[in-house]
């Protein structure tokens, strides 16, 4: 048995303006080369663009987008008897949110457009409406898990 003590799970801090943990998770995920102030600028500009596009509370659009992209189940490669199987596993809420944020940023980087704030705001609005590449990625993951349901006993 390990002698190392159990670590406490870190709670995400909230950002200075909106006091929202999801915004802070998004900032930390978009961060490159330690330039956090630039990451905050991108997120806040995207939030302003969402406000202009939808004329509703941008944080509710963000919550709705993340809720729509969050997967319930994913597949994990597991090697059994010389062959690798894609085994479906259930995902917890924290890991699901992290995956959703990662997929939203991946989809917004892939979009053609002017700047990251514009692309991110467009992707968030689309995800809140139930369309966009991030939603497609979630559906693809769920389809993979459904197709490999026979391997669920390898968990």
From Swiss-Prot:
Which keywords does this Swiss-Prot/TrEMBL entry list? Chloroplast, Plastid, Ribonucleoprotein, Ribosomal protein, RNA-binding, rRNA-binding
Alphabetical GO CC annotations of the entry are: chloroplast; small ribosomal subunit
- UniProt cross-references to SUPFAM superfamilies, sorted A to Z: Ribosomal protein S7 (SSF47973)
Q: Which GO terms describe its molecular function?
A: rRNA binding; structural constituent of ribosome
Q: Name one GO biological process term.
A: translation
Instruction: Tell me the InterPro entries matching this sequence.
Output: Ribosomal_uS7, Ribosomal_uS7_bac/org-type, Ribosomal_uS7_CS, Ribosomal_uS7_dom, Ribosomal_uS7_dom_sf
Where would you find this protein in the cell?
Plastid, Chloroplast
Subunit annotation = Part of the 30S ribosomal subunit.
The Swiss-Prot or TrEMBL record describes its family as follows:
Belongs to the universal ribosomal protein uS7 family.
HAMAP family according to UniProt:
Ribosomal_uS7_B
**What is this protein's function per UniProt?**
One of the primary rRNA binding proteins, it binds directly to 16S rRNA where it nucleates assembly of the head domain of the 30S subunit.
The protein in question is named Small ribosomal subunit protein uS7c
Q: Which gene encodes it?
A: rps7
């Amino acid at each position: 048995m390990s002698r190392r003590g159990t670590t406490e799970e870190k709670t995400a801090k909230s950002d200075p303006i909106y006091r929202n943990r999801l915004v802070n998770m998004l900032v930390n995920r978009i961060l490159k080369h330690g330039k956090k102030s630039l990451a905050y600028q991108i997120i806040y500009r995207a939030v302003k663009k969402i406000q202009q596009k939808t004329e509703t509370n941008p944080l509710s659009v963000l919550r709705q987008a993340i809720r729509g992209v969050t997967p319930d189940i994913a597949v994990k490669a597991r090697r059994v008897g010389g062959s690798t199987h894609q085994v479906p596993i259930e995902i917890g809420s924290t890991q699901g949110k992290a995956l959703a944020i990662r997929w939203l940023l991946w989809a917004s980087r892939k979009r053609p457009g002017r700047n990251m704030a514009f692309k991110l705001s467009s992707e968030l609005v689309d995800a809140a409406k139930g369309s966009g590449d991030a939603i497609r990625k979630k559906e693809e993951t769920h389809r993979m898990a459904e197709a490999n349901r026979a391997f669920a006993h390898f968990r």
